[in-house]
From Swiss-Prot:
Cellular-component GO terms for this entry: extracellular region
Organism lineage string: Eukaryota, Metazoa, Ecdysozoa, Arthropoda, Hexapoda
Free-text function comment from the UniProt entry: Cecropins have lytic and antibacterial activity against several Gram-positive and Gram-negative bacteria.
InterPro entries: Cecropin
Pfam families: Cecropin
Main location (coarse class): secreted
Secreted recorded as keyword: yes
Family according to the record: Belongs to the cecropin family.
Organism the protein comes from: Antheraea pernyi (Chinese oak silk moth)
Protein name: Cecropin-B
Compartments (UniProt record): Secreted
GO BP annotations, alphabetical order: antibacterial humoral response; defense response to Gram-positive bacterium; innate immune response
Length: 35
């Protein structure tokens, strides 16, 4: 029961880390498109 919860937690952390890393890149791409 708890293993599933831990797995979800790990996936959520990976997604959050990915968003944090991707955030600046997305912002730069957005500015490049705006120009």
């Amino acid at each position: 029961k708890w293993k599933i919860f831990k797995k979800i937690e790990k996936v959520g952390r990976n997604i959050r880390n990915g968003i944090i890393k991707a955030g600046p890149a997305v912002a730069v791409l957005g500015e490049a498109k705006a120009l």
